[in-house]
Swiss-Prot record:
Binding-site residues, ATP: 127-133
Subcellular location, principal: cytoplasm
Official protein name in the record: UDP-N-acetylmuramate--L-alanine ligase
The family this protein is said to belong to: Belongs to the MurCDEF family.
Lineage of the organism: Bacteria, Pseudomonadati, Pseudomonadota, Gammaproteobacteria, Alteromonadales
PANTHER family named in the record: UDP-N-ACETYLMURAMATE--L-ALANINE LIGASE (PTHR43445:SF3), UDP-N-ACETYLMURAMATE--L-ALANINE LIGASE-RELATED (PTHR43445)
Enzyme class: ligase
Role description: Cell wall formation.
Gene label: murC
Organism: Shewanella frigidimarina (strain NCIMB 400)
Length: 485
């Protein structure tokens, strides 16, 4: 059966949304919103969307036939059947107000994702860290096994050139967002939880027990024949496991894990390990990603694929040939500075645990390099809530260039800004950080800071990602020695 025939068969089994033809996204340029819009436009729906600026997501959607509107205005929703919003959108947005006045249904992003998943075999990946990488690895394994899944990911899957794709099979592999508890809308067949830590606590009223209970509720959205795939190395996951009334498959480095990694080693950007599973032969894996945290992400993909009887050869090949995800330990090149050659890596991690995992991966893969990090804190509330953890983790690099907080719409919080964090790290006495008041000042500092052989990392979830690309395009007047990846 050809892919066209397979897709026609799939569509015959999935009812169209009754009377819904024209779908409008408010904030369509976000990765999550844009991914769902891409799947829907490829399914044949008329897609429009608004955002405050053009970006790579909106450009791709426009090339696929979506109508992109820059700016938010009431008339944008006058001819649509449903409006999709994310929690980042202000309720006073003129398009939201107009939709309410016109009695047009307004649904959250996760509700639309749940609708896509309703008649498919859904695999939903949740957790504080590692969701994007794990989702990408699972999608890659299923693609290698010719399962041709639909996927919606929170980052760019390099091999696909996009973060979302409409497949021809019954599978939908999607990142599940706990930041606003909207993942409770999803009803997958398989749920993955990578880990659970305190983050986005404003959603949960500062109550960590409420956050844990919400993850339990998410797993109980599984049908009685579904499966929860969980990282047993995580302390909080071990704590909630007795509360899970579904089949559980565990993974990790722990000997208790159903899917266990042994013999881990790292060589530069690659990790190698052997996977042990009950009732199956051991398999040697080479993963084209660095760090123990990425081995855990790969174990989740192996566990999901093994439950679905995907052949080990597809798993081995997909992990070995994995091309990575945008802004996840992304190697941007080798640059010739006035003081010598410097390696540039960009990473999205913005929680202390994520930053620590990145530091460990850098140390393990390039032990002889001095580690220089330009870090941009993300959100005042996160900086406040995890302040001491940030001080501890950021003190572990060799040289720190600390930018001010990327607000992400939040009002400043006294004592939780970049200057305060810089002072606290300096008082710790391990390193003497350099405060960078504005991102556009970073390039001017680098010639005096970088040394031959350094590993220079740009780290954070704000606009430092765009800044790293500018640096990679010779914003310092540096010559790229290795082609950008």
């Amino acid at each position: 059966m050809t892919k066209t025939e397979r897709y026609a068969q799939l569509r015959s089994m999935i009812p169209e949304m009754r009377r819904i033809k024209r779908i409008h996204f408010v904030g369509i340029g976000g990765a999550g919103m844009g991914g769902i819009a891409e799947v829907l436009v490829n399914e044949g729906y008329q897609i429009s969307g608004s955002d405050i600026a053009i970006n790579s997501v909106t450009e791709r959607l426009a090339s696929l036939g979506a109508k992109i509107i820059i700016g938010h205005q009431a008339q944008s929703v006058e001819q649509v059947d449903v409006v999709v919003v994310s929690t980042a959108i202000n309720p006073q947005n003129p398009e939201i107000i107009a939709a309410k006045e016109l009695r047009i249904p307004i649904v959250r992003r996760a509700e639309m994702l749940a609708e896509l998943m309703r008649y498919r075999h859904g695999v939903a990946i949740a957790g504080t860290h590692g969701k994007t990488t794990t989702t990408s690895l699972i999608a890659s394994v299923y693609g290698q096994a010719d399962r041709d899944p639909t996927f919606v990911i929170g980052g760019l899957l390099n091999s696909a050139g996009t973060n979302a794709r409409l497949g021809t099979s019954r599978y939908l592999i999607a990142e599940a967002d706990e930041s606003d508890a909207s993942f409770l809308h999803l009803q997958p067949m398989v749920s993955v939880i990578t880990n659970i830590e305190a983050d986005h606590m404003d959603t949960y009223g500062g109550d960590f027990e409420k956050l844990k209970t919400t993850f339990v509720d998410f797993l109980h959205n599984l049908p009685f024949y579904g499966v929860a795939v969980m990282c047993i190395d995580d302390e909080v996951i071990r704590e909630i496991m007795p509360r899970i009334g579904r089949q559980v498959v565990t993974y990790g480095f722990s000997e208790e894990a159903d899917v266990q990694a042994i013999n881990f080693a790292q060589n530069g950007h690659q990790s190698s390990f052997t996977v042990k599973r009950h009732g199956k032969d051991n398999v040697d894996i080479v993963l084209n990603l660095p760090g123990e945290h990425n081995v855990l992400n790969a174990l989740a993909a192996i566990a999901v694929a093994s439950e679905d009887d995907i052949d080990d050869s597809a798993i081995v090949q997909a992990l070995a040939e994995f091309e990575g995800i945008g802004r996840r330990f992304q190697h941007l090149g080798e640059f010739e500075t006035p003081n010598g050659s410097v390696m540039l890596v960009d990473d999205y991690g913005h929680h202390p645990s994520e930053v620590l995992a990145t530091i460990k991966a850098a140390r393990a893969g390039w032990p002889d390099k001095r580690l220089v990090m330009a870090y941009q804190p993300h959100r005042y509330s996160r900086t406040r809530d995890l302040y001491e953890d940030f001080v501890d983790v950021l003190s572990q690099v060799d040289c720190l260039l600390l930018l001010d907080v990327y607000a992400a719409g939040e009002a400043p919080i006294p004592g939780a800004d970049g200057r305060a964090l810089c002072r606290s790290i300096r008082l710790r006495g391990q390193i003497d950080p350099i405060f960078i008041a504005s991102p556009d000042q970073l390039a001017a500092v680098l010639p005096d800071v970088l040394q031959h052989g350094d590993l220079f990392m740009t780290q954070g979830a704000g606009n430092i990602g765009a800044l790293s690309k500018e640096l990679a395009q010779s914003n310092l007047g540096c010559k790229v020695l290795v082609e950008e990846q």
